[in-house]
A protein has these predicted regions:
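Polar/charged low-complexity regulatory segments
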Residues: 1-139, 143-151, 155-197
Length: 197
């Protein structure tokens, strides 16, 4: 997914052209099916927006492509226009448990300077997300806890009583054998450090 370019996003460096090519190929060859879950559509949208962030369309090319068009379905770094954001209304009224689960699945979207409807939903429900983080830790669901922690670090505004930094340390200690957990925890730390500067 888009986390392939995460080091470039977090450190503000140009990605390796080979990494861009791999992500571009994934976007083009594996578009979501029309009946794909919302999380799949959002993941695909984020891969496209990440590619465009580092490899924008050629100068002078404009236009918009939607998810129903051929370009929208498989458009990457060389595409023209933009891929429309999928619907995120399903997040607004989701119970906090489901909300946290869905956001942890969408943790790759939790990056700085990448606004989206999912990010706005997360920012509007930081208390629910903090609750979900604690619940995931108590249930020993380290991947969900790491994903929720990454969102909290990306958007800020978590309750001070949460102790996110120590919570992330614990999540990494207990679940760090899973590379996805380690990735989310380290991304969260980098974003929290950048916010503190």
């Amino acid at each position: 997914g888009a986390d392939l370019l995460l080091p470039s996003v977090l450190y503000g460096r140009h990605p390796h052209p080979g990494d861009v090519a791999v992500l571009d190929r994934a976007v083009r060859e594996f578009p979501p099916k029309p009946d794909a879950p919302a999380a799949t559509a959002w993941s695909h949208w984020h891969m496209i927006s990440t590619l465009q962030r580092f490899a924008p369309p050629p100068p002078g090319v404009t236009g918009t492509t939607g998810p129903g068009t051929a370009a929208g379905a498989g458009a990457g770094a060389g595409m023209t226009g933009t891929y429309a954001e999928p619907d995120a209304a399903w997040l607004e009224n989701a119970p906090w448990q489901s909300f946290t689960h869905q956001l942890s699945v969408l943790a790759p979207l939790a990056v700085p300077a990448a606004p989206s409807a999912v990010q706005r939903a997360a920012a509007d429900r930081t208390v629910d997300l903090a609750r979900g983080f604690v619940r995931a830790v108590r249930r020993r669901d380290w991947l969900q806890a790491a994903g929720a922690g990454r969102w909290l670090a990306a958007i800020g505004g978590e309750p001070a009583t949460l102790g996110l930094e120590r919570g992330l340390d614990f999540v990494e200690l207990m679940g760090g054998h899973d590379p996805r957990v380690t990735l989310h925890v380290r991304a969260a730390r980098l974003m929290a450090e950048a916010r503190a500067r």
